Amino acid sequence: MSGMYPQPLMMMPQQQRRPRKPRTKSAPKPPTTSKMSEKTKKEVTKSTMSTEKQIPMPTIPAASKGSLKDLDVRNNLNQQELNGIYYDTVNNLNACHGRMIFQPTGGSLTEGTLTVTIKLRVKSDQCLKMCSAFHKRNTNLETPLSAVDISKESEKSLGKD
């Protein structure tokens, strides 16, 4: 019965394995679209990796450059448009679980422009908590934009970068 199984011709010497390199903790990488599902891809491309929205300023004629009234955002956008921009930014924040950074040029939203930067989150519970807390506080669109003091809100919820 020894002819049933072929005998190995020669035992190959086993090669020694190289020791593994010790893993070092590297900085977390931003999400890549190749590993994402289609739904997530759409959300990321829709909100983009870093989205900036700036409330447009009116063009100022040379004759009235000295007048600050022409610089007022409220002369250029009505309340509904302001609420729309605000709603979009909150939605983008919610879609990408990011951080929203407000940069008002004046002391509050009633003065000057407001730049909103949305950044995708690094995996962190603290960041998610901040986002959800911010979102819960600011989803009420009945509150006019000018009544919300964004500069103080951002310091409380986001901390210093």
Curated annotation (Swiss-Prot):
Top-rank taxon, per record: Viruses
MF-aspect GO terms: RNA binding
Predominant location category: virion
Compositionally biased spans, kind Basic and acidic residues: 36-45
Basic residues biased stretches: 17-26
Cellular component annotations (GO), alphabetically ordered: ribonucleoprotein complex; viral nucleocapsid
Signal peptide interval: none
The keyword Transport appears for this protein: no
Positions of the UniProt region annotated as Disordered: 1-52
Keyword Transmembrane helix: no
Bias type Low complexity, positions: 1-16
Keywords: Ribonucleoprotein, RNA-binding, Viral nucleoprotein, Virion
Localization of this protein: Virion
UniProt record similarity statement: Belongs to the torovirinae nucleoprotein family.
Function: Major structural component of virions that associates with genomic RNA.
Identification of the protein by name: Nucleoprotein
Gene source species: White bream virus (isolate Blicca bjoerkna L./Germany/DF24/00) (WBV)
